[in-house]
């Protein structure tokens, strides 16, 4: 029985890591394009997208192409899903929408071009993006540490 439990824990740990790794590899190029255009670190973009969409597997992520939990019209006639979250025609549009939202905030000009991911995450969280800013920041920073540290 102990061996079975160990095997299950190992499997689920690997699956979780594998899913995170897949999300980061699938959207790395898109996030880098967004970094070039908006000067927001690509790893911040990826970590927020991963957290808010469950690695792209959440209902909102799949049906509304919304990887960032952005609130707005869900367009149920198009998406087939009524929600308080915004519908995007493509995942790419969701990434653009996130970067445009962040670039409209007061802290953006001060951080634009900075590679300090902690400052970005803390500013986004304290700027009203997350209901529980402290927990959200801690989680996003942990995702960044796991996937973006060299």
Predicted regions and their residues:
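Bacterial Sec-dependent N-terminal signal peptides
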Residues: 1-21
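Catalytic cores of secreted/periplasmic lytic hydrolases that degrade extracellular macromolecules
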Residues: 16-150
């Amino acid at each position: 029985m102990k061996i079975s439990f160990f095997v299950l824990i190992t499997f689920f740990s690997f699956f979780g890591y594998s899913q995170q790794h897949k999300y980061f590899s699938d959207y790395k190029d898109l996030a880098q394009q967004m970094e070039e255009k908006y000067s927001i670190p690509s790893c911040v973009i990826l970590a927020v997208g991963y957290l808010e969409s469950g690695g792209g597997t959440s209902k909102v992520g799949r049906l509304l192409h919304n990887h960032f939990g952005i609130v707005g019209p869900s367009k149920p006639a198009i998406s087939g899903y009524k929600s308080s979250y915004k519908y995007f025609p493509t995942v790419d549009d969701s990434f653009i929408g996130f970067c445009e939202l962040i670039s409209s905030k007061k802290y953006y000009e001060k951080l634009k071009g900075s590679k300090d991911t902690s400052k970005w995450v803390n500013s986004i969280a304290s700027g009203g993006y997350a209901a529980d800013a402290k927990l959200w920041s801690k989680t996003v920073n942990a995702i960044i540490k796991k996937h973006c540290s060299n």
